[in-house]
């Protein structure tokens, strides 16, 4: 049995915490009745060991063991820095 680690990409929406960030993951979902595709957002708390992310950065994250009550994802890399 192979266990593939889940990885996702998203945008940083908050970096106010120490060693933690909040990442918004956007996905498209089809409406069950009308068939229109709707944009849905999920916010995940992510562990950022070196505090290297800022708001607006595009990041890659992966699932890990639970680090706190709400944090079970860790930062893999910063894909694209935000233009300020």
UniProtKB/Swiss-Prot annotation:
Alphabetical list of InterPro entries matching this protein: NA-bd_OB-fold (IPR012340), Ribosomal_uS17 (IPR000266), Ribosomal_uS17_bact/chlr (IPR019984), Ribosomal_uS17_CS (IPR019979)
Domain of life: Bacteria
Keyword annotations: Ribonucleoprotein, Ribosomal protein, RNA-binding, rRNA-binding
Name of the protein in its database record: Small ribosomal subunit protein uS17
GO CC, alphabetical: cytosolic small ribosomal subunit
Function: One of the primary rRNA binding proteins, it binds specifically to the 5'-end of 16S ribosomal RNA.
CDD domains the UniProt entry points to: Ribosomal_uS17
MF (Gene Ontology): rRNA binding; structural constituent of ribosome
NCBIfam families: PRK05610.1 (NF004123), uS17_bact (TIGR03635)
SUPFAM superfamilies: Nucleic acid-binding proteins (SSF50249)
Family, per entry: Belongs to the universal ribosomal protein uS17 family.
UniProt organism field: Klebsiella pneumoniae subsp. pneumoniae (strain ATCC 700721 / MGH 78578)
Pfam families recorded: Ribosomal_S17
Keyword rRNA-binding: yes
């Amino acid at each position: 049995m192979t266990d593939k680690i889940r990885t996702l990409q998203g945008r940083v929406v908050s970096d106010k915490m120490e060693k933690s960030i909040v990442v918004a993951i956007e996905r498209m979902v089809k409406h069950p009745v009308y068939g229109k595709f709707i944009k849905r957002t999920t916010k995940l708390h992510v562990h950022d060991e070196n505090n290297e992310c800022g708001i607006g950065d595009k990041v890659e994250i992966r699932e890990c063991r639970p680090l706190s009550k709400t944090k079970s994802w860790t930062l893999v890399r910063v894909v694209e820095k935000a233009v300020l």
